Amino acid sequence: MIVRTLDECRNSERRVVSDNWESVRMLLKDDNMGFSFHITTIYEGTETHIHYQNHLESVFCMSGEGEIEVVGGETYPIKPGTLYILDKNDEHYLRAYKNKEMVMACVFNPPITGAEVHDENGVYPLVD
C-alpha cells in the first residue's frame, strides 16, 4: 500500500515549478501502478502550449476557471467539476483566467518519472 499526503509531496522533490504552473507529482512511474497522478496548479492569467505526443492525460478541475483550446479545433470552458481527456495526444493551449488559478487532478499514461519538463514544443519526452 502507498499512502502519501499532498503536503508531504509538496515539500519534496515531487513538486515541480515552472513559469505558468506547478505540479505536485504524487504517484510516479517508480511506484509501479501503470499511471502517474499529479495535483497541478495553473497560475492565473497564463497561457501554456502543451502537446503530449508520448502520453495520454485526463484532467479534472477541482477549482478555478479557464479554458482549453485544441489547436485547429474548438475551445472549451473549464470550471470546477469539468473533466477533459487528451485521448488523441491533442495539441492544445491551456489558459487560466485572471484571478482564477486552476487546481487540477491529472492522470498520465504512460506514467511519468517526475524528471520530465516540457520541451520547446510543449512535449514531455519518454524517460526511463
Curated annotation (Swiss-Prot):
Gene3D superfamilies: Jelly Rolls. CDD domains: cupin_EctC. Its EC number is 4.2.1.108. The keyword Signal does not apply. Transmembrane segments: none annotated. One of its GO terms (molecular function) is ectoine synthase activity. It catalyses: (2S)-4-acetamido-2-aminobutanoate = L-ectoine + H2O. It holds the Pfam family Ectoine_synth. The keyword Cell cycle does not apply. It comes from the Bacteria. Signal peptide: none annotated. Belongs to the ectoine synthase family. Catalyzes the circularization of gamma-N-acetyl-alpha,gamma-diaminobutyric acid (ADABA) to ectoine (1,4,5,6-tetrahydro-2-methyl-4-pyrimidine carboxylic acid), which is an excellent osmoprotectant. This is L-ectoine synthase. The gene is ectC.
